[in-house]
């Protein structure tokens, strides 16, 4: 082992620290405290919920679940976008020891059926009528699924009605039997490296990082705050932050997605925003597009460089020159002010997780007045962020340090391993896969590569399974280059390829909305088909600038020599994106195998003239072939003896052709081999 860092726990969880206890303690402290808000579908008006009201609703639904035959250990499926009802069911299941099994709202009927078949639930909740129809079709084929309730058809009221015969004392007895080490949920991994697996997580897995998180990020997580929650609650990251806000002094604004993100930011006025990298890339890309070309575009580019450097200087020395201060005032007034305004007047923290984010983009946001950019690291198997930047120790570019009582170390290959009370129980019905990642000493193999500095800060360098080994034997991590390419406003995803190939290449997926807007700004046809856009010289030249930026950070052997722009978008339906918008690399490589092999790495026809010796042999061979054909035609009308003589001549000609050959001369072969070796070097 190269390095290990394990902080002492600031708070040791007890058996009573369940997820339901986070809500019940909050309601007991102040039942009139505002705890949640949800939007009306038609008017988009926010509706308030107090802590006491939410607790009362959760208890009523919990009694209804008991009335339906749900008990400790029973599986309850939730197939819905993020909404207040999702949160109520989550806490109701936690209260009675039932196991919630979330299904992403974007999962197909086949994917939902696969999960339901594996966990055998007796009850499922749907977010709308379409999800209800899917679940009812699945129910016809799975006898274990008895009940389907639709949130949009007053499903919670219907469930609560089944609890009329369940007394408060009975419910309290059931709640008291639930302990921190009991299973809380089965969360299916996003499947970015293969088939999704069901990770079993306990109450303690979550409550340990929630309660210790209040200590290291008190201002952001525990003090009165407002969280706009639009990430899918099927994702561990969103689930964790919901528990944080409910258990502290936060208000959760439940939203089904980010369709109206800017308008919702203005109306809800959050104090911090939780997002995956794509959210922040889109905010930056929108601002960059709005600036456009010309003077405004150049000012925006200068502002970007300034905010990045300001953040770096603040982090390293905390000092700025008089010139830098004057520039900062100017760039805040012409660029920073509008972005701050779009984020809302109360925004203080931006938190990013779920995947790596380009470090300069993180510095860009962090360099603006009043914004602290926080990065963290976690996975489904660790109940989300177990490594995070602390309030008094934030290093942009790092994912932070392990939280109290949690540890990180690297093995000899540079793979990160983690440990702590937050590490999952195992994969559901897959003990052999659990044994592959969960070691005998309690440490978990993450599959991610990284480094740990002297102060315990962790830096992610790539994904172990994503490492590309070129034909020349060079090991290349695609993540650093992809991070830079993805900052191009018209790019959704760049996927670096080259395993077993002579050089590194890339597939480029365009952001179709942004690229059409960009074309219009350039005075080009924005309505042309995507097939033409993908081949457009201006589009290619613009992306080339970002490829060159990426190449500037790596050696020639690691640089992208060639890229191909795709004319279609990645999607969950195609299998190329997970529900949390991560690229499923194996599926991308398989889907675009023909593009990779026959476009990116198509052998080039040689324009180099053949050496004179080869030209002479070539002409000789052609003359022999012509003579052979003439003799064949003549032989058709001669005697058998002459025909036999012709056949003998044919054999001699064939042997002569093989001896002279049309292949490369030794000189050419050596030259080609030397060129290839030079390119790989």
Where on the chain are the PLM-derived regions?
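Conserved ATP-dependent adenylate/AMP-binding module captured primarily in the ANL superfamily
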Residues: 74, 90, 107-137, 209-228, ...
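Structural core segment of the AMP-binding/adenylate-forming
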Residues: 68, 95-162
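Conserved pre-ATP/AMP-binding loop-to-beta segment of ANL
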Residues: 32-34, 150, 166-188, 195, ...
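Conserved AMP-binding/adenylation subdomain of ANL enzymes
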Residues: 207-337, 346, 368
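ANL superfamily adenylate-forming
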Residues: 40-43, 130-180, 287-338
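Conserved AMP-binding/adenylate-forming core of the ANL superfamily
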Residues: 36-91, 108-113, 160-163, 203-204
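Conserved AMP-binding A3 loop
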Residues: 47-52, 184-210
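Conserved ATP-binding/catalytic segment of the ANL
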Residues: 402-405, 409-470, 487
